[in-house]
Amino acid sequence: MLLVGSGAKFVQQLEQAGALAIYVTPEGGSEGHYLRRLRGAGYEVVTLSSKGIGDLASYLTRIHGVRPATLGKSERRTYFFPALIEQYRATLPPKAKGLVFWFYEGHVFSQQELSYLVKLSREDKGVKFVVELGRERSIRWQPLQSA
């Protein structure tokens, strides 16, 4: 059985760093413990897949277009969605500490995209990022700028 700590150190380091790189176990399940700890600390957590996002800056901070797959003879359309950060910030409860975006499959991000997440977390103190960068035998994390 995997022995998991209280998660208080994880929340504290996320608040200090703003963005964390996390390495989870291959069998999974342990990250749910840390998600619950973040929610218990007053954060609203949004889990997203890193694959298929496209331009990360547009996706998080600007109105961006999304084109669904064309199936045969249907016409090509573009739908426009608001910035993801503003969309979730509008629905935050009044007592929430902020938003945490948890990206799984984060190994597909380039180094430039990871540094953008660090920069964005420093500019906007109400937004934090956790990126799953790989697998290890036991769960560990470190600040994203040193990953």
From Swiss-Prot:
Any keyword Transport? yes
**Per the UniProt record, which residue ranges are transmembrane?**
none
Q: Which superkingdom? A: Bacteria
Q: Which keywords does this chain's UniProt record carry?
A: Membrane, NAD, NADP, Plastoquinone, Quinone, Thylakoid, Translocase, Transport
Membrane disposition = Peripheral membrane protein
A GO cellular component annotation in the UniProt record: plasma membrane-derived thylakoid membrane
Enzyme Commission number(s) = 7.1.1.-
| MF-aspect GO terms | oxidoreductase activity, acting on NAD(P)H, quinone or similar compound as acceptor; quinone binding
A Pfam family the protein falls into: NdhN
Primary localisation category:
membrane
Q: How does it assemble?
A: NDH-1 can be composed of about 15 different subunits; different subcomplexes with different compositions have been identified which probably have different functions.
Similarity comment: Belongs to the complex I NdhN subunit family.
| Protein's job | NDH-1 shuttles electrons from an unknown electron donor, via FMN and iron-sulfur (Fe-S) centers, to quinones in the respiratory and/or the photosynthetic chain. The immediate electron acceptor for the enzyme in this species is believed to be plastoquinone. Couples the redox reaction to proton translocation, and thus conserves the redox energy in a proton gradient. Cyanobacterial NDH-1 also plays a role in inorganic carbon-concentration.
Q: Which HAMAP family does its entry note?
A: NDH1_NDH1N (MF_01353)
List the protein's name.
NAD(P)H-quinone oxidoreductase subunit N
Please tell me the species this chain comes from: Synechococcus sp. (strain JA-2-3B'a(2-13)) (Cyanobacteria bacterium Yellowstone B-Prime)
From the broadest rank down, the organism's phylogenetic lineage runs: Bacteria, Bacillati, Cyanobacteriota, Cyanophyceae, Synechococcales
